[in-house]
Amino acid sequence: AEKLEQSQAQALVDPLTNVLNRAAYNLKVGQLIHEFKRYKEEWALLVLDIDKFKDFNDKYGHQLGDRVLKSVAGTVRDTIRVSDQVFRFGGEEFVVILNRVDQSFATQLAVKICRQVEKDYFVDGDKKLKVTISIGGSIITEDDTESSLFERADKAMYQAKNAGRNQVVMAI
């Protein structure tokens, strides 16, 4: 039984970044939407995307790209609160659930994540390389479904990219 629990837990973790994966996100977001309808505790969804990651990977290789993914995941995990969760959604995209936050606090945390990632650098030979992220966020509303909440945050993330990257846009 213990081995089964272990393998079930491993099935919810991204092996490269060691953060929760998309399957874990799908389980968690459904539960949180249900709880919101019952208890009315606000929470936020952030969608984070590493800016120009494909170009970075093409130029510096997948090994360094993997280091970047691990580092960004770790930075996000270290920046958010213990009650929050980070998930690798796929590729260079991460999703963060911020529990018990309003729009203002969610925005502050998102900006803090953005700035922390911006401070990190990666050594490749004699070069110090940096990456940035764009973040879109949304606060849960009464009418939200799993897809509507994600779509709002994802759209906001693309607005952040289109506005010049390395920034946060919160959906209203």
Task: Label each PLM-derived region with a short phrase.
Residues 8-9, 22-42, 73-81, 99:
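Short regulatory alpha-helical coupling segments
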Residues 9-27, 48-62, 70:
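Conserved nucleotide-binding and Mg2+-coordinating catalytic segments in signaling enzymes
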Residues 54, 69, 76, 87, ...:
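Short beta-strand->loop micro-motif that forms the acidic, two-metal-ion catalytic signature
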Residues 64-85, 93, 112, 117:
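Active-site-proximal alpha-helical element of nucleotidyl cyclase-like catalytic domains
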Residues 68, 95-115, 142, 148-149:
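Short helix/loop segment flanking the catalytic signature motif in cyclic-nucleotide metabolism enzymes
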Residues 85-88, 129:
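A short pre-motif secondary-structure segment
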Residues 107, 125, 139-172:
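Catalytic-core segments of nucleotide cyclases and related cyclic-nucleotide turnover enzymes
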Residues 117-133:
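Catalytic core regions of nucleotide second-messenger enzymes
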